[in-house]
């Protein structure tokens, strides 16, 4: 892809994301959001790199009108990482400390045995798998804390 096109796409997505966040903060209109700690059959953690913000994050996003959190996380994982199949999926009992004003509420899911086929798109530039003991330096503290919590066996039995 041409560098100027990549830059333009990233700039457009960043501006759209920041505008949405500003509107949500001002109006208090943020809705329920979902995100997932996705674990491969080999025990590696799947993280995504967005086109509009730095660092590695859990996949997820906002719910559509009338969508349950379970439906929303499956849709988001199919859109963001190309989720094909999984062994277990369930909502955790740990609160979601999502700082995104568009996505509030305790909707952190644990997905195990995840098989996926990623294709880059406007929102997600890359996915990568990481050892739970060797998460990237540029992932939020909340991701590190959720992974440590999961490793400690505090996750809801699925």
Residue spans of the language-model regions?
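Nudix hydrolase/Nudix homology domain
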Residues: 54-55, 120-158
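Active-site-adjacent beta-strand/loop module that shapes the phosphate/pyrophosphate-binding cleft
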Residues: 94-118, 128, 146-150
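Acidic, metal-coordinating catalytic segment for phosphate/diphosphate chemistry
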Residues: 1-35
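A short coil-to-beta-strand element that immediately follows conserved catalytic motifs
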Residues: 84-93
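Conserved hydrophobic "DFG−1" position in protein kinase catalytic cores
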Residues: 38-39, 47, 111, 129
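Glycine-centered C-terminal helix-capping/turn motifs at helix ends
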Residues: 82-83, 129
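Conserved Nudix-box catalytic region and its N-terminal flanking loop in Nudix hydrolases
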Residues: 40-79
